[in-house]
Amino acid sequence: MKKVVKFGGSSLASAEQFKKVGAIISADESRVYVVPSAPGKRFPEDTKVTDMLLHVYETAKAGEDITEEMKAIKARYDEIITGLALKDFSLDKDFEEITKKLVENPQVDYAASRGEFLNGKIMAAYLLSLIHI
């Protein structure tokens, strides 16, 4: 029987957490559908990526510059990608597109969903890298 597994934000907040999740998924071949959350808090004072994205939405909606906020969010993802040693993987184009869409036509649902979308891309690349080792 095929299984759906969902991992919350704290389970996917860092590269180390991703590695634990990868091991959990790999340990059972029936775990074929993976539903990732956006990165959560890495430590108590940290901010969840979804909260960061919702703040970006508010900033964009007000017509203000979102460049620095988007850089901070991208840095979170880049830290995970580097920690997972995904050498040929990048979210640069995704961040360009997300930034453009939020500047041109800010939509709260779109902003809130990008964290899961991006973490899903990282998870897929990471799981594929485990197969190719």
Give the role of each language-model region.
Residues 1-131:
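Nucleotide/pyrophosphate-binding catalytic subdomain
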